[in-house]
Design a protein with these regions (language model features):
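Extreme N-terminal starter segment of soluble prokaryotic enzymes
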Residues: 1-5
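Generic secondary-structure signature for well-ordered alpha-helical cores
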Residues: 26, 30-34, 65-68, 101-108, ...
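N-terminal beta-loop-helix "entrance" segment that forms/cooperates
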Residues: 33-57, 231-233
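N-terminal glycine-rich phosphate/adenylate-binding segment common to multiple enzyme folds
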Residues: 49-162, 248
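Glycine-rich phosphate/pyrophosphate-binding loop and the adjoining helix
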Residues: 142-143, 147-186, 190-191, 196-198, ...
Length: 360
């Protein structure tokens, strides 16, 4: 099979980590009879330098015409880069918002995996994490409080601010379907997180999620209030498989989940919509302070590529192979500087990529 991938290397360490992900994909393609065709597209600061825009219409059209999009990282040093003297809509990160909107991506998936080999980097006690954990946070991206009507006014000399939280049942239904589909490929458990004891929007969320669950009888659905979920993530993270939640709750919980894994350099991310076309990227930033020094950890980007194979291309075996290769390299004691510990072997970006390829 041939697959067309729009590659947005972006800024900082983006080109380095994307190079390693492409090498891994090419190895998988060679082993399993696939051909991955890459079209390089400018995004973020490099696009601003070349075109004056963080994402051009032409770049967006290329992305729309591809089977998937693989992104490195966007942005620079806020205190030093001229990009941040520009209006907000012309800054690097605006390109990311633009492509999510342009591709109608409404679901963000962030896996939170603690590999057994990296337990020492986890801030939680060993008796809590055991042999590690593996769950995903699925966050709705385009509705809720962040996109509702807002205002700030002064009434009788008193300042007053209002934000509006709105969801309709179609918005809830489409992301709930994604959560159940992903659970079918994992542990077949969905935990829907809300604040249904207080919020009408959460009560609707809970109702619609239960309706969708009827189409997935193999998947176990549970409901959890968001404050309890925040506690359970640090008390017993192993209980979770797929956490489904709305925009603001997901924003907070996914960051909490990322911290208990020990290193953000290990965390992949996917943004999905109604079609198989998705945006795959590491959760970390562009790290301009180490750009070009062969120090960046490419694993999050490589794992993002594995997610692309699984969710956009339905190549489950190939995705599993990449993830197993990452685990094998970690088990042998190889580490980039961000996850380095005593007794391990320090390697650079390129070397880590080569080691993972050798295990495929």
């Amino acid at each position: 099979m041939n697959y067309n991938i729009a590659v947005m290397s972006g800024d900082g360490i983006g080109p380095e980590i994307i190079t390693e992900a492409k090498k891994v994909l090419d190895k998988v393609g060679s082993n399993y009879g696939h051909k991955f065709n890459y079209t390089e597209v400018l995004m973020g600061g490099v696009s601003i330098d070349a075109t004056g825009e963080p994402l051009t219409k032409e770049a967006l059209e290329i992305a729309k015409g591809s089977d998937s999009v693989l992104l490195g990282a966007v942005g620079g040093d806020v205190g030093k880069s001229n990009w941040y003297s520009l209006p907000p809509h012309l800054r690097p990160e605006a390109g990311l918002l633009a492509i999510r909107k342009g591709l109608n991506l409404f679901a963000n998936i962030r896996p939170a995996i603690l590999f057994d080999e990296l337990k020492g980097a986890c801030p939680l006690k060993e008796e809590i994490v055991g042999s590690g954990f593996d769950f995903v946070v699925m966050r709705e991206l385009t509705g809720g409080l962040y996109f509702g009507e807002r205002s700030t006014v002064e009434e009788n000399g008193v300042r007053k601010a209002t934000d509006t939280l709105v969801y309709d049942e179609n918005e809830v239904r489409r992301i709930a379907k994604w959560a159940f589909e992903i659970a079918m490929k994992r542990g077949k458990k969905v935990c829907s997180v809300d604040k249904a004891n207080v919020l009408d929007s959460s009560r609707l969320w809970r109702q619609v999620t239960k309706e969708v669950s009827k189409d997935y009888p193999e998947v176990e659905l549970s409901d959890m209030l968001v404050d309890n979920c925040a506690m359970q993530l640090v008390k017993n993270p192993k209980q979770f498989d797929v956490i489904l939640t709305e925009n603001m709750f997901g924003d907070i919980l996914s960051d909490e989940a990322s911290m208990i894994t020990g290193s953000i350099g290990m965390l992949a991310s996917a943004s999905l919509g109604d079609t198989k076309l998705g945006l795959y990227e590491p959760s970390h930033g562009s790290a301009p302070d180490i750009a070009g020094q062969n120090k960046a950890n490419p694993i999050a980007t490589i794992l993002s590529a594995a997610m692309m194979l699984r969710y956009s291309f339905d190549l489950e075996v190939e995705a599993d192979k990449i993830e197993a290769a990452v685990k094998a390299v970690l088990k042998k004691g190889y580490r980039t500087i961000d996850i380095m510990s005593e007794g391990m072997t320090l390697v650079g970006t390129k070397e880590m990529g080569d080691l993972i390829i050798s295990e495929i």
